[in-house]
UniProtKB/Swiss-Prot annotation:
Pfam families reported in the protein's UniProt record: YtpI (PF14007)
Keywords: Cell membrane, Membrane, Transmembrane, Transmembrane helix
Annotated membrane topology: Multi-pass membrane protein
Gene: ytpI
Chief location category: membrane
Subcellular location: Cell membrane
An example Gene Ontology CC term for this record: plasma membrane
Organism: Bacillus subtilis (strain 168)
InterPro entries: YtpI (IPR025618)
Protein name as catalogued: Uncharacterized membrane protein YtpI
Native organism taxonomy: Bacteria, Bacillati, Bacillota, Bacilli, Bacillales
Length: 100
């Protein structure tokens, strides 16, 4: 259970880090990449929280709510990953063009 608490805290730190980095970023593609990374971090936070609740408490309501959190968190992390994979090559081309 301590591992899940550590992962929840780490996910929260990454979420805040990428949100702040996204606000401070100048190019729009860099903002989109930071937004995608923060979406992955928030999704993992919700997923780990749901998993932690399911392990700690064994009532039917907790299992249902934990399952919902796991599904929502996994969906958010997956959507963030897909967005990151979409924007990363575009950002690399833009950076290559700017430095050439």
């Amino acid at each position: 259970m301590l591992v899940l608490v550590f992962l929840i805290g780490l996910s929260a730190c990454f979420y805040v880090y990428y949100k702040v980095k996204g606000v401070r970023a100048k190019p729009s593609l860099a903002k989109e990449i930071c937004s995608a990374k923060s979406s992955m971090a928030l999704g993992s936070l919700v997923l780990f929280y749901g998993l932690n609740q399911m392990i700690l408490f064994h009532s039917v309501l907790t299992l249902v709510i934990g399952g919902i959190f796991i599904v929502i968190g996994a969906g958010s992390a997956w959507a963030g990953y897909k967005a990151f994979r979409h924007y990363n090559p575009l950002h690399a081309k833009e950076a290559e063009r700017d430095h050439a």
